[in-house]
Amino acid sequence: MTIRENLEFPLKRNLKIFDQQKLNDLVVTALQEVGLEASINKKPAELSGGMKKRIGIARTLILKPKIMLYDEPTAGLDPVTSAEINELILEMRNKYNTSSIIITHDISCARTTSDRIIALFGGVNKMEGTFTELQATKDEELIKFFNY
């Protein structure tokens, strides 16, 4: 399956769009949004980890959701690529006026992309607030995790 086919899939399945010109326009626009229009005919195995993350974002954005769910968006990425993905998340959130739910163990990602953070440990909500509020916590588990 090429990147084009990967991005066409939710359009065909969820939105029932089958007109090839419309599909092409939507796919090209989504890939331009994430800076990967040149990868349209590549296969996923030909992409770097950061490129795959961008394709995942494009595949979701193509459906114009009100809420974006990111599950470990920077996992396995180097610091530079992680920062680029964080910036892309913010850019897309602002451009499309979407809310984001970000599940992450990456403190930099949480600090950069989040207005509010819920810190869960063992399925228990240990704290909720801004990153600054979390930094001020006296909770030993949070301090150990955030390593301040």
What are these regions (language model features)?
Residues 4-12:
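Short helical segment in ABC ATPase nucleotide-binding domains corresponding to the A-loop/adjacent helical element
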Residues 20-39:
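Conserved ABC ATPase "signature" region
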Residues 43-47, 51:
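Conserved ABC ATPase signature
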Residues 62-66:
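A short, proline-enriched helix->beta-strand linker immediately N-terminal to the Walker B motif
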Residues 68-71:
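Catalytic Walker B motif of ABC-type/P-loop ATPase nucleotide-binding domains
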Residues 79-81:
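Helix N-cap at the start of a conserved alpha-helix in ABC-type nucleotide-binding domains
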